[in-house]
Amino acid sequence: MSVLKLKNADFENEILKKEGIALVDFYADWCGPCKMLAPVIEEISAERPDVTVAKINVDEEGELASKYGVMSIPTLIIFKNGEENERIVGFKQKRAILSML
């Protein structure tokens, strides 16, 4: 499954109204750790087709980042059945992220 690039308008239908697990990466193009995390997110998306994986650019979707209290990037939020379940701030290795899904 490919990584979804979400806008505020898509977030509710793609993440909040879906059953199952979703991994949402809040990032910015200029962020070094975000760039390091990008291939890890792609790998997780390929390895875990049962998980909805999405990216949200905080520079373009500041309202959504603010709504979820994203203060540092990268921030990964894991949703289960539309509810926030876990939060990871900063770069993490793939195995650490997978263990939280």
Name what the model sees in each region.
Residues 26-39:
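Conserved redox-active cysteine motifs that mediate thiol-disulfide chemistry
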Residues 22, 62, 68-77, 95:
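Structural micro-motif
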Residues 11, 24, 41, 57, ...:
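Residue-level signature of catalytic and energy-coupling elements of molecular machines
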Residues 2, 7, 27, 54:
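Conserved Rossmann-like nucleotide-binding pocket used by diverse enzymes
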Residues 3-21, 62:
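A short beta-strand-turn-helix
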Residues 19-21, 38-56, 60-62:
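Conserved helix-turn-beta segment immediately C-terminal to the redox Cys motif
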